[in-house]
């Protein structure tokens, strides 16, 4: 959902804060695209759905009614349906509406409980609105609630990160996504090295405090009750991407939708294709498997890669169990992946 009330200076995702007049036309295109994708792939059942953005809560909840008229017949009681939302725009009425449509997981872009850090990150909600949003989510009937936090900014110290983690204890949520600030290209934060601490110590501390708050780490940035949708990405499962800026992956081919709202409205079903080679698929499996509980299947590695992985097992950097290599320290995932890949 590529609409936002304001554009955050660190965000490189495709979105716009000044094209709300196109929402109606966009949803018509989205409906057409979704219908086309489901029929062309002969989808009979959906295991997970994720409404991301952008900011899905920036759009009137009634716009999702027609979308769910297609999705609902393909869902089961076990289907995980997540909506991303911002604390300032996800009011009780909006939350109740999407809950009645079938949503059962809500993800709030909190980013911080400190007002100065929120302002630095370009967020337009307050600390108080985070608590109110979670309260409203419970009132609407949500039992699976995620918060996003950002750390390793110039504002962060151990003392402040401890306070961030302490706030989690006072909220009844099931999941936390904690992301180290990335200075993405083509954003206002690009190249602003002073904006980021780049501290391994802070990253380790944040992970420790999050786990002490009761959220078990299962991926480098994710803690708590496992998000089935994201787990599917790391497992290399097929998924459809629907909407402007979306990306899909089916049987080794990646599909890219149009990367502007206008272009998508004009050609909603158009996709650029990228066919991944066997070695590229293995590379992704290694990198994603080592940064999560998914692990790396020994049977997908060549002999040299297996030797290097076994060397890491001997040196207690990896664990080996039931035909898979597992990484006990996700912060080292990229270095280990590069070593194994060779």
Tell me the role of every PLM-derived stretch:
Residues 313-323:
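A short, conserved structural fragment
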Residues 324-328:
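Minor-groove-contacting beta-hairpin "wing" of winged helix-turn-helix DNA-binding domains
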Residues 329-342:
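Short, amphipathic alpha-helical interaction segments positioned at domain boundaries
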Residues 12, 16-39, 47-300:
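C-terminal scaffold of the Radical SAM
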């Amino acid at each position: 959902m590529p609409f936002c009330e304001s554009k955050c200076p660190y965000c490189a995702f495709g979105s716009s804060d000044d094209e709300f007049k196109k929402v109606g036309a966009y949803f018509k295109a989205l409906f057409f695209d979704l219908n086309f994708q489901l029929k062309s792939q002969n989808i009979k059942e959906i295991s997970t759905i994720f409404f991301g953005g952008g900011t899905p809560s920036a759009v009137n909840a009634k716009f999702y009614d027609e979308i769910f008229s297609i999705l609902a017949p393909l869902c089961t009681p076990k289907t995980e349906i997540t909506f991303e939302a911002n604390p300032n725009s996800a009011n009780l009425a909006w939350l109740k509406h999407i809950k009645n449509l079938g949503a059962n997981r809500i993800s709030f872009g909190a980013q911080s409980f400190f007002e100065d850090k929120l302002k630095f990150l370009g967020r337009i909600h307050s600390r108080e609105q985070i608590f109110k949003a979670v309260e409203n989510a419970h009132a609407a009937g949500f039992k699976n609630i995620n918060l996003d936090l950002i750390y390793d900014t110039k504002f962060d110290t151990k003392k402040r990160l401890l306070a961030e983690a302490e706030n989690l204890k006072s909220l009844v949520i099931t999941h936390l996504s904690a992301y180290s600030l990335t200075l993405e290209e083509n954003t206002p934060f690009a190249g602003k090295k002073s904006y980021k601490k780049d501290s391994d110590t802070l990253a380790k501390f944040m992970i420790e405090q999050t786990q002490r708050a009761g959220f078990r780490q299962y991926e480098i940035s994710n803690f708590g009750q496992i998000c089935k949708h994201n787990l599917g990405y790391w497992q290399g499962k097929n998924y459809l991407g629907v909407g402007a800026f979306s990306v899909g992956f089916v049987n080794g081919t990646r599909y890219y939708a149009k990367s502007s709202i206008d272009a998508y409205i004009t050609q909603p079903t158009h996709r650029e294709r990228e066919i991944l080679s066997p070695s590229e698929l293995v590379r992704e499996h290694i990198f994603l498997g080592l940064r999560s509980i998914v692990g790396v299947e020994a049977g997908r590695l060549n002999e040299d890669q297996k030797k290097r992985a076994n060397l890491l097992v001997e040196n207690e950097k990896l664990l080996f169990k039931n035909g898979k290599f597992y990484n006990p320290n996700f912060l080292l995932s990229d270095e280990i992946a590069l070593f194994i890949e060779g």
